[in-house]
Amino acid sequence: MEYNKLSNEIIAKLQALVGVQNVVTDAGQMEIYAHDEVTDPAYHHMPEAVVFAENAQQVAAVVKLANEYHFPVVPRGAGTGLACGAVPIYGGVVLSLEKMNKIIEVNADAMYAVVEPGVRTSDLQAAAAAKGAFYAGDPCSGDSCFIGGNVATNAGGNRAVKYGTTRHQVYAVEVVNPTGKIVQLGARLQKQTTGYCLEQLIIGSEGTLGIITQITVKLLPLPKYSMDLLAVFEAPEDAIGTVNKLIMAGIMPTCVEYMDNITIKSVERYLGTSLQGSEKGNYLIVEVEGTSEDDLDEKACTMDEICSENGAGDVLVAEHDKIWQARKAFAEAVRAESLIVCKEDVVCPVDHEPALLAEILRLADKYQLVTRIASHAGDGNIHLNILKQEQEDYADWDARVKANQQELYRFIYAHGGRLSGEHGIGYKRKQLMEEFTNPDELEMMRAIKKALDPNNILNPGKIFDIE
């Protein structure tokens, strides 16, 4: 793909649009915008400029200029992505939305909030809770990621098993389209069948079809009663195999999370702490909400019985803060062990999850890969982290990782799965997307991209290539 470089004339025009203070061209200051949370330098690409937008009008003006001068624009939130979705692989402008960070409205009576894309997810949760309401989106990076990035990637997280992913929390979005027009998509309605559902098209499109500048999200009543159970299993397949049994028993958990024992030990080292039952096996962390203490007790008894019948050696009431700190420290603990990690985000139907985990373990042994595994087990989403060891040759390690991927993805697609559950495709998984996705699906996606972004300005080279 050919794009024009940013000339002094273009830089001056950008400065006129957003202010001199909001345009950065110094290489040292731009380095952090050359990558997301993928630490492998092979995936890093420097922008030619970083532009900080303060409102939708500035975003629109930058996109119009990009179409006029034919340079790429890569929207960026907090940079916490794991698929290189905000990496400027063709240079051009990284358009940062971090200054668009206002919580515009929290309406607990009508159960909605309106926010800008640069609002931290945990800040939205706190603002809702302060009004007695609840925002259900809960990615593990909630203390650092932005709500705009959540929408752009359709982020999942711990509570997706009960409340769904980000797309289930969004009523409407304001978007700057690829030609620079500000458009309103969706409405604060519980249902509608009024033409195409365009706001849902934008959600999960990773900045390739529009730049999100405002979001109206759904709020729920703040849960009054909840508890966390920790079931410890010696056998990984028993832990994962219990998930569907819990759901089929009529218990709808808020969260069901899996951590294998070696990952638990890694997190203990990273946090410098000792976790309940860590010496006994693999974790299944189950959070459940109830209408009363008695309701919780009844659900806890049922879960204890099901877990014990299916191989749990211990079923404990978990220390809430400590167990969730441990689960959410997974990524940081892995990073502390190795800076070069292949992070897989595979997803399959929940009833196929035990078979998928068994295949992951078989392939890791076959290709002699060091792994750390955690899972949003309640929705079939397994996070397989493959760590390069210091003594391993990079080329040899990378070849084994790629061979593992080929077998793994063939297995996943044969079992009705997909290669990403919540992290997105970005640049990192683009080749695999094109290799394993149904050609008819890809053709439809490309047709949409070409129709909405005829100059291929917005986040080019992500998800798939334009032929």
Where are the language model's segments positioned?
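N-terminal flexible segment immediately upstream of the FAD-binding catalytic core
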Residues: M1-K64, G81-M111, C140, T263-T273, ...
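Activity-critical C-terminal alpha-helical subdomain
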Residues: K181, R429-E467
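FAD-binding subdomain of flavoenzyme oxidoreductases
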Residues: K102-E257, L458
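Alpha-helix capping/hinge segments and adjacent helical runs
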Residues: V20, Y413-I425, P454-L458
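C-terminal substrate-recognition/cap domain of FAD-linked oxidoreductases
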Residues: D26-H35, P221, V232-A235, I240-E407, ...
